[in-house]
């Protein structure tokens, strides 16, 4: 049976140093992969490209921070992950193997089981007589499994912590500090790139489903009453095309996306926020710039039963790959005020933003007046506890209490008339609000795999990884025409050192025939080869070879840095850089 593309990439990955299973000498552990020298470079360049698209091009509104990998339990109780971050599992009663229940149902029956409840999955397994795919044993009951990696912080029992499953919570907890440091401006984007962990039940798709991986994520904080004003760069992408498969279209059985202009998608309510739509359009450009054609990208809207607990609307950004079909490479979510409101409630801290009015205005407000003297006289020793509890209450809670016939605080009934609602006039200079959040979140490792797959070519029996030039792990190779000529080697070494000092990632190769060396460079995606030949010794010129066309031009050795920079970063055509070399 012929190798499929995934198997070819796995072979190259191991042999040339892109990636391989972690802990191989101990048999490996599912869901963990190492990035080798070339894979690490490729991943780093993709991260830098993401930073360019999401941070640097929006740096007047977006900043980047770094937060801890481990967080205390109370953070993840507040975020809802302790309660909601679960997947359904089912165990074989014979061999003891554990499977993710919805995936087992999908693979056995060819249906979409995402979002089905535990009881629905259990019913399907019983009614359809599904058995263990490994030993054909009987399957047990479907249960839920929490995907958080649990740990202990310090030597203290009960000090529970979790490895972060996303970068978002570190950003939300740090929001107030960043907001104040950025002079209290909204909109505000806070980006972060870092490692996360999810204790996946049965990861079986190599780099596509890992237990530890890198995320590139941004939380974009906006004023919910000024959605358009919160996206000052919308015009940059207004005419961009978004291929969207809506939830309603999925329910009708449709599988192909419909193309929407960004502005059209927002105005028609397909995307509920211009900010959400804008970052989707940026995400489209980013993935295209990894070498993925637009017809292999789409956005799939998730239904209410499929969305995460914090989301009002979510679109998965999908890319079509050879082995698994459509896979998610990013999630775009409108998280509303869920996260900041939860952290305000559990921490007791004010995480609101303030928007000043053009000039102060006078407004009428209802206020609750607490008669502390009456409470003190009536409750005596218990008054202190009651007053402290009243001090922690918000205005809305106090108003509800004052309006009730029988007000009870800290288990004590308040004396009649001790809480009064009055109407007052106040001069206000602005309004406070809980910012809403739009989140683009990209799985770095999946995007690296996608870049590898779409770069793969076979040309005249040779493998070429035709990466976009600016993400190629190695940018150039320097080659003396022959390895045993001291003068050629000396000049080649000089060119190599010049490129290294100029900041390029470059390697030197003088082993084997020149054709074999070109092939080695093509196989790892090196976009440019600089060859030092006998003409170099005569007139000081070298050849610059294009990986994708195999054509060459002659340029001055003293021009190599400038010409290579234009070729790699500016997308210059080879023919515009020098004099063509006849084949």
From Swiss-Prot:
MF terms from GO for this chain are: ATP binding; glycine-tRNA ligase activity; protein dimerization activity
Q: Which InterPro entries does the protein's record reference?
A: aa-tRNA-synth_II, aa-tRNA-synth_II/BPL/LPL, Anticodon-bd, Anticodon-bd_dom_sf, Gly-tRNA_synthase/POLG2, Gly_tRNA_ligase_arc, GlyRS-like_core, tRNA-synt_gly
- Positions bound to ATP: 198-200, 208-213, 328-329, 443-446
Which top-rank group of organisms is this from? Archaea
Class of enzymatic activity (EC top level): ligase
Q: Which UniProt keywords apply?
A: Aminoacyl-tRNA synthetase, ATP-binding, Cytoplasm, Ligase, Nucleotide-binding, Protein biosynthesis
User: What is a biological process (GO) this protein takes part in?
Assistant: glycyl-tRNA aminoacylation
* Amino acids binding substrate: 100, 166, 213-217, 439-443
Where does the UniProt entry say this protein principally localizes? cytoplasm
Entry GO terms, CC = cytoplasm
Pfam families named among the record's database cross-references:
HGTP_anticodon
Q: Where in the cell is it found?
A: Cytoplasm
Kindly state which reaction or reactions the protein catalyses: tRNA(Gly) + glycine + ATP = glycyl-tRNA(Gly) + AMP + diphosphate
Which EC number(s) are documented for this chain? 6.1.1.14
The family annotation for this protein states:
Belongs to the class-II aminoacyl-tRNA synthetase family.
Instruction: Give the protein's function.
Output: Catalyzes the attachment of glycine to tRNA(Gly).
What NCBIfam families does the annotation carry?
Answer: glyS_dimeric, PRK04173.1
* UniProt-recorded name of the protein: Glycine--tRNA ligase
**Organism placement in taxonomy:** Archaea, Thermoproteota, Thermoprotei, Desulfurococcales, Desulfurococcaceae
